[in-house]
Amino acid sequence: MSHVDDGFRSLTLKRFPQTDDVNPLLAWEAADEYLLQQLDETEIRGPVLILNDTFGALSCALAEHSPYSIGDSYLSELGTRENLRHNGIAESSVTFLDSTADYPQAPGVVLIKVPKTLALLEQQLRALRKVVTAQTRIIAGAKARDIHTSTLELFEKVLGPTTTTLAWKKARLINCTFSHPQLADAPQTLNWKLEDTGWTIHNHANVFSRTGLDIGARFFMQHLPENLDGEIVDLGCGNGVIGLSLLAKNPQANVVFVDESPMAVDSSRLNVETNLPEAFERCEFMINNALSGVEPFRFNAVFCNPPFHQKHALTDNIAWEMFHHARRCLKINGELYIVANRHLDYFHKLKKIFGNCATIATNNKFVILKAVKQGRRR
């Protein structure tokens, strides 16, 4: 939990999920403060759009202006809602939209936290291009090290004249004025053929490894089990290639695709529709924080390629939460399979949670682990 006085409100903010007290990560950064310093409340005219507000620092500060919080992270939405409540601000003050929604017309102010993925930034700038005017104040912010020449060129190409500020507390801002430059249309998804399958994989802008199959998933797919039945889960599904493979290998199983990214879940849905349409009725698609709210003892197996970062921050909190949720939602003798970088040492984490862990396969970079839910039903 951390405190920030940004000139608009004095706020107490926390990350979501919360980090441990030993190595706490802040729920805001200098770029948030720097962005807010540029605004005079008396000059805000028209809708306020906030893009990629990780834990709600900007949304909480500008809540009295009824901002729209736009992004591709359900965790960020949950974190923002939690921080609104914690600071005594009505959740209804902020309208949440995912990045593929239609943005409000003629915004007065647009504040952008530059995302980690350049493809997501381009998708968002193209969406803004349809609604901003020459009078819209457009300001983006990030750590100085995360603003590159390619970032500035993208703003110039999609929106118009772009300048940068001096660095402040290692943060830098981008100021942009809309001039409606000529711009060719771009496809909504990036598509590629998955070797040895005949499948075409569709990827929205913010999907992990959208340009091709990542090597961890490739290794995982070589060791997926067959002859499963009942409900199984592709947890943190991304574009859904693991779940798609499970559908093909296990015709008696139903697959639940789960991710906190709306773009990921929509990519998974599209990939089942186009590649295994006959299996679509065996699928469920869920935007969720891991398996929050899912009933216990529901699933026969969970498959997971857990992230070890949240936006720009390295953390195993999300993976830890996924493992705990998986154990709660597995049936007795249900199995959790994960693929992970060897250096992360998830073997001992799983053994601590499940009381057991076995190595299924390993290479010089990755390991595939299996843990089984044991014990009596509680």
UniProtKB/Swiss-Prot annotation:
GO molecular function: 23S rRNA (guanine(1835)-N(2))-methyltransferase activity; nucleic acid binding
Principal EC category: transferase
Reactions this protein catalyses: guanosine(1835) in 23S rRNA + S-adenosyl-L-methionine = N(2)-methylguanosine(1835) in 23S rRNA + S-adenosyl-L-homocysteine + H(+)
Organism domain of life: Bacteria
Keyword Cytoplasm part of the UniProt annotation: yes
The keyword Transferase appears for this protein: yes
The protein's role, per its UniProt record: Specifically methylates the guanine in position 1835 (m2G1835) of 23S rRNA.
Family that this chain belongs to: Belongs to the methyltransferase superfamily. RlmG family.
Protein's name according to its UniProt entry: Ribosomal RNA large subunit methyltransferase G
